[in-house]
Regions:
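Conserved ABC ATPase signature
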Residues: 150-154
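Helix-to-loop junction immediately C-terminal to a conserved catalytic motif
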Residues: 52
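Conserved ABC ATPase "signature" region
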Residues: 114-145, 194-197
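A short, surface-exposed alpha-helical micro-motif characterized by mixed small hydrophobic
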Residues: 217-219
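The feature captures the beta-strand-to-loop junction immediately N-terminal to the Walker
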Residues: 37-39
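Conserved ABC transporter NBD signature motif
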Residues: 60-67, 79-80
């Protein structure tokens, strides 16, 4: 089995004849926190969309956990443990934090009306397990005091923490973080960083993040991948990136 949880090989995506991602190749090492940086229009978000199954590629392949997942839809990848968060958090604003977390696991018995009618004991037992896990998640992320708060009332940083919590409800293997620091104040960004590091060390999560804040990237990521014109320009430590004249 490869040490790399993700391999991108010669991936290309065209929009109207223009290459947003061009013959792009990179590896994400299992257990790492990898940063991806680059100017606007360098192809970072399009690359994430291709990996996460939100877009179909024109050429190349994506290998996740030694399986070819090229163009596999995002909902199938979700079930395999590859999750992507967005620059703008997507929460159910009228539900509480706890309810948002409990909505995540798929194929719950209670989703089936027949099960709800003829197997109420099974449904209640499963709901109890999911609720207990949701409480474990809010405790892990220090959100216990907000468990019964409506998600729509949370700050930008708290919503990002809630998105991280969702990944914990399905035991993600690889999480793609798209501008985790966007719209987040410095204090909550520090909390987000702490939560990511904790998930990485204690739960063995692998992360790959797009981020413009170089201080945050330097604190969090090794290696750092630099993209330009839809492909990888350079890869190294944050210090090597800072010293490289091409970057």
């Amino acid at each position: 089995m490869s040490d790399n949880i993700l391999q991108v090989n010669n991936l290309t995506k065209l929009f109207g004849g223009l290459a947003a991602v061009s013959n792009c190749s990179l590896n994400i090492r299992s257990g790492s926190i990898t940063g991806i940086i680059g100017p606007n229009g360098s192809g970072k978000t399009t690359l994430f969309n291709l990996i996460a199954g939100n877009l179909k590629s024109n050429d190349g392949e994506v290998i996740f956990n030694d399986e070819n997942i090229t163009d596999v839809p995002s909902h199938e990848l979700f079930g395999r443990g590859l999750l992507r968060t967005f620059q703008i958090a997507h929460e159910f604003s009228n539900l509480t934090v706890l309810e948002n977390l409990m909505m995540v696991p798929s194929n719950q018995s209670g989703e089936n009306l027949l099960n709800a009618l003829i197997k109420p004991g099974l449904v209640k037992k499963e709901e109890k397990v999911i609720r207990e896990k949701a409480y474990e998640v809010v405790d892990f992320l220090n959100l216990t005091h907000l468990a019964n708060e409506r998600a729509g009332n949370l700050s930008g940083g708290q919503k990002k923490l809630l998105e991280l919590g969702r990944t914990m409800m399905v035991d993600a293997k690889l999480v793609l973080l798209d501008e985790v620091g966007a719209g987040v104040n410095r204090t909550l960004l520090k909390d987000l960083g702490t939560a990511i590091l904790k998930l990485n060390k204690e739960k063995n999560y692998t992360f790959c993040m797009i981020e413009h804040d170089m201080d945050f990237i330097s604190r969090m990521c090794d290696p750092v991948i630099v993209m330009a014109d839809g492909s990888v320009l350079f890869e190294g430590t944050s210090e090597e990136v800072k010293k490289n004249e091409k970057v």
